[in-house]
């Protein structure tokens, strides 16, 4: 990271804690590594991101429905999915610092450094060599590349590395009252399997026809050996996933459709298009025949925020094999080639999967601005979160200009009329300018000030967050003004 991007990232983290967005979990006990809590404004922002995704994915599609599956699943589920045997990362230790790293991430950081230095040929060559080693699971070759490119441990500065080894990422625990009789169960490492084992339940109970999708938002858990970069990589995190079931042979068409649709969802929030890019996977997961990531340019480089995968029929076929239950769908549609119904088959699956915590961080970074408002007369600045109004934790703040003359009572009256429909904050402490600054810092789109004129003609002053412009409006219009400002139509139309 350059000094400016490094500073931006540190400032966002500091801001998140200071203003109640994200806290270190169990902080009074010195915290727990890579585990975070969302504060009063963070939980609101997170819920608004979830609502935006759910509306775009479920409410706007007649053939997509939602479920909420359990975190604990039968342990055979994870054997069938391949997670017990194949869910691991290539790790390498530095013998001097005793720190552990993902070998591929060390190499990716080096590739990014070559790119920034203009050494494109070197970057492309290393990328190709790393991809080849990952595809063939050649762990010794990964170590060779680390040594060849003189990659040093960022802590010790030495190149005294162990061999590369694979580490399984699943958390296991026991279910049962007596330890020796207890069954081993896992905290789910992804939410997708809860959808797959329920796909026929949903299809039959909802009379769904192919193509159709099942969406879910939920917690997942991975025993990340290397957890870093704030909430980018955590051991407990939240996913927003949709599995779309299609007729075999149509998966390429649907894959391209969802790839395009999902990027549009991100761009609708107003993020500059150049901040995003597609990244094609060279090493495909055991279940996929095509995979792209939508990556965002974080201060520390491009990182995945959403994956679009063509999972073929792998998961459903595996669950059919391990459970002994038929996972086939009967398709009554007539095949033009044979003039007969398509009949029984196991559907192919297109997956879209977002890391909600990464989406949260992306949103904070995009919105965070430090503005210099100095004039010749005085020095001034403000920190503002220019969040999309639909995502803002607080939709409006209501201030009485002073704490007397009936102004607080009138402000409360206006708040009571609006709070059923909007998340509001009431503030009467400090000068009006300081109150504006506090609301800017949490991303509140408008502030409504009640003054003595309000008592005369029922008008209030609205101050807009981004422009800081003020206008006088009738208090009776506030419900419509706020409703138009934060309507989901602004994002979903």
Predicted regions and their residues:
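NTP/phosphate- and nucleic-acid-binding module
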Residues: 1-493
């Amino acid at each position: 990271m350059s000094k400016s991007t490094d500073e931006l990232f540190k400032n966002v983290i500091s801001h998140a804690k200071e203003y109640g967005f994200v806290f270190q979990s169990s902080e009074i006990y010195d915290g727990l590594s890579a585990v975070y809590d969302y504060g009063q404004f963070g939980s609101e922002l997170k819920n608004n991101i979830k609502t935006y995704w759910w509306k775009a994915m479920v409410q706007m599609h007649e053939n997509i429905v939602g479920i909420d599956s359990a975190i604990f699943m039968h342990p055979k589920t994870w054997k069938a999915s391949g997670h017990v045997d194949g869910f691991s990362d290539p790790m390498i230790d530095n013998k001097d610092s005793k720190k552990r790293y993902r070998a591929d991430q060390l190499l990716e950081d080096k590739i990014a450094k070559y790119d920034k230095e203009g050494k494109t040929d070197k970057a492309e060559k290393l990328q190709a060599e790393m991809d080849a080693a990952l595809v063939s699971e050649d762990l010794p070759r990964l170590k060779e590349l680390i040594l060849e490119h003189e990659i040093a441990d960022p802590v010790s500065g030495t190149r005294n590395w162990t061999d590369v080894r694979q580490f399984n990422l699943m958390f296991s625990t026991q279910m049962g009252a007596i330890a020796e009789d207890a069954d081993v169960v896992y905290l789910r490492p992804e939410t997708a399997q809860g959808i797959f084992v329920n796909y026929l339940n949903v299809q039959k109970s909802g009379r769904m026809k192919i193509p159709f999708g099942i969406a879910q938002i939920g917690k997942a858990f991975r025993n990340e050996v290397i957890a870093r970069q704030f909430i980018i990589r955590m051991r407990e995190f939240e996913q927003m996933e949709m599995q779309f079931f299609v007729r075999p042979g149509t998966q390429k068409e649907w894959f391209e459709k969802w790839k395009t649709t999902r990027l549009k969802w991100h761009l609708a929030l107003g993020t500059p298009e150049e901040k995003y890019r597609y990244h094609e996977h060279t090493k495909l997961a055991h279940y996929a025949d095509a995979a792209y990531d939508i990556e965002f340019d974080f201060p520390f480089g491009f990182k995945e925020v959403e994956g679009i995968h063509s999972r073929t029929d792998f998961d459903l076929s595996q669950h059919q094999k391990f459970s002994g239950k038929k996972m086939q769908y009967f398709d009554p549609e007539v095949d033009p080639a044979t003039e007969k119904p398509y009949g029984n088959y196991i559907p192919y699956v297109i997956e879209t999967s977002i890391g909600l915590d990464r989406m949260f961080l992306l949103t904070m970074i995009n919105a965070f601005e430090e503005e210099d408002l100095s004039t010749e007369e005085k020095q001034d600045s403000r920190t503002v979160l220019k969040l999309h109004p639909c995502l803002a934790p607080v939709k409006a703040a209501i201030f009485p200009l002073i704490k007397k003359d009936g102004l607080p009572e009138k402000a409360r009256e206006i708040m009571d009329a609006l709070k059923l429909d909007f998340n509001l904050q009431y503030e009467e402490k400090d000068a009006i300018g300081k109150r504006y600054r506090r609301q800017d810092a949490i991303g509140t789109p408008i502030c409504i000030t009640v003054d003595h004129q309000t008592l005369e003609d029922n008008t209030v002053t609205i101050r807009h967050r981004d422009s800081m412009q003020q206008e006088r409006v009738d208090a009776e219009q506030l419900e419509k003004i706020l409703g138009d400002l934060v309507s989901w139509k602004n994002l979903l139309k």
